[in-house]
Amino acid sequence: MWRIMMKSKLHRATVTAADLNYIGSITIDSDLMAAADILPNEKVQVVDNNNGARLETYAIPGPAGSGVICANGAAARLVQPGDIIIIIAYGIFDDREARTYQPRVIFLDARNKITAVKKGEQPGQVWV
């Protein structure tokens, strides 16, 4: 059996821009993509903590060290600058690997700088 599991996530990223006229995707600082093991054009889920919106799109790299998180295309209708979001990447694992895999969780501050890198999540853990 194959299982779709969280592979990694960028936790509490701050949206820096929204470009309705771009053809699609979410632009993410390439340093953050590398930290979260997200490849260019990889499918990601975006969860907006401000309004509850959820969407799927693909990641494109932004300038390294810039902190850019830009919702492009239709996503700009759901995610606005200043919103706090979670960007989640998933992987497909066989049953055995799924039971032991520990996802990489990248915690960010308000300027999208990495504050912590953790493996896995603990039930009841709160990070604000």
Curated annotation (Swiss-Prot):
Post-translational modification: Is synthesized initially as an inactive proenzyme, which is activated by self-cleavage at a specific serine bond to produce a beta-subunit with a hydroxyl group at its C-terminus and an alpha-subunit with a pyruvoyl group at its N-terminus.
One GO cellular component, as annotated: cytosol
Cofactor note: Binds 1 pyruvoyl group covalently per subunit.
Entry superkingdom: Bacteria
Any one Gene Ontology BP term: pantothenate biosynthetic process
Database matches in InterPro entries: Asp_de-COase-like_dom_sf, Asp_decarbox
Primary localization class, coarse: cytoplasm
Catalytic reaction equation(s): L-aspartate + H(+) = beta-alanine + CO2
UniProt-listed Enzyme Commission number(s): 4.1.1.11
Matching SUPFAM superfamilies: ADC-like
Residues annotated as binding substrate: T57, G73, A74, A75
Keywords: Autocatalytic cleavage, Cytoplasm, Decarboxylase, Lyase, Pantothenate biosynthesis, Pyruvate, Schiff base, Zymogen
Catalytic residues (UniProt): S25 (schiff-base intermediate with substrate), Y58 (proton donor)
General function of this protein: Catalyzes the pyruvoyl-dependent decarboxylation of aspartate to produce beta-alanine.
Name of the protein in question: Aspartate 1-decarboxylase
Organism of provenance: Moorella thermoacetica (strain ATCC 39073 / JCM 9320)
Gene from which this protein is expressed: panD
